[in-house]
Amino acid sequence: MAQIGINAWVWSSPITTEELGRIAPIVAGMGFDLIEVPIESTTDLDYRKGAEIARSNKLAVSVCAAMGPDRDLIHPDESIRTNGMNYVRHCIDAAQTLGAENLVGPLYSAVGRTWQATPDERRRDLDLLVHQLRELAGYAGEHGVMLCVEPLNRFETSFLNLASQAVEVVDEVDHPACGILLDTFHMNIEERSIGDAIRAAGSRLRHFHTCENDRGAPGSGHVPWDEVAGACRDIGYTGPFVIESFTNKVKSIARAAAIWRSFAVSQDRLATDGLRYLRALL
């Protein structure tokens, strides 16, 4: 049976120790297998207590990086690059303590930063990212954590938009602790064929975000879910499928993710509808 999870951002932000303690029993009670924990501030969550919360609710864990303006592995400003590297190392340590196998997200640049680049400039940025990720993957591997690099849509980054671009990066990093996260919300915008994108990622695919075209519950929009499931079967994907959505009740996350309306009658309903659909699909 597929491992199905949900990101705690569906209900709240930031995810503090208290919020995780509130949300985890809800997630477990609904029948999810995994909770994805975003790390916004490095002081929000007591990771040892977080691990206890997850264990007591029989939930596996993944960790989601929040790449803000001062956390960017390829920024022209060296101090911002250094801060980004330190933040990702912190997330790796957090993942190990939480018992998470995967650290996921756009592990290259700040969300929302876009820029024009010549082919030579892009090659320079790629070389820098490969160097940075190779170092981080070494650290992650020592801590039993897999880095999962996520392409985003063109409105959130200009650097990695396609599965094929993530494949290029991961192949150049060439480290067993560096893989790919694909997200159907972003693929629906950028990929000409979602199935082909998944097949291109192949064995590099280690994490999967199941998001509807409007970031609502899977099955409520027009993402071609049969194509998604078929392609995942084609490549023998056995990793988690995680619902990632957001609440418009928390202004900071609503603004960051451009969430201006609700996608279901309640966040609980979004979660249960999505879980029911994915269980039937997968």
Which residues fall in each region the model found?
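Active-site-proximal loop/turn and secondary-structure-junction residues that shape catalytic pockets
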Residues: V10-S12, I39-S41, M67-P69, S109-V111, ...
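Histidine-acidic metal/acid-base catalytic patches
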Residues: M1-A28, G99-E101, L160-L182, M187-L282
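Conserved beta-strand positions in the central sheet of alpha/beta enzyme cores
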Residues: E36, S62-A65, V104, C148, ...
